[in-house]
């Protein structure tokens, strides 16, 4: 059982590292999406409604929103799974 304990501890450490790396990756992507969103709103404010393509604005915003939801949904699942594994590891002691 000692080997199993060490294997589980190693798996938890690996999962922790993967979680941090994925969080950082998603944070960078979310920053790019936020920049794109800022550009969209700036363009919208800079033009009269007749001159700016609202279809493009709506389509791009929908894509940005969907990607953000995907990012944070995946991150939330990873966090919940990691939290569960931490609790299981604590209970094994």
Predicted regions and their residues:
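Extended, charged coiled-coil stalks and adjacent low-complexity, Ser/Thr- and Lys/Glu/Arg/Asp-rich tails
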Residues: 1-93
């Amino acid at each position: 059982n000692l080997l199993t304990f060490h294997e589980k501890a190693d798996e938890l450490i690996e999962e922790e590292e993967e979680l941090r790396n994925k969080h950082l990756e998603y944070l960078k992507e979310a920053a790019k999406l936020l920049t794109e969103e800022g550009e969209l709103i700036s363009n919208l404010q800079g033009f009269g409604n007749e001159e700016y393509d609202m279809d493009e604005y709506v389509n791009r915003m929908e894509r940005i929103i969907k990607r953000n939801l995907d990012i944070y949904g995946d991150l939330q699942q990873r966090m919940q799974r990691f939290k569960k594994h931490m609790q299981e590891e604590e209970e094994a002691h």
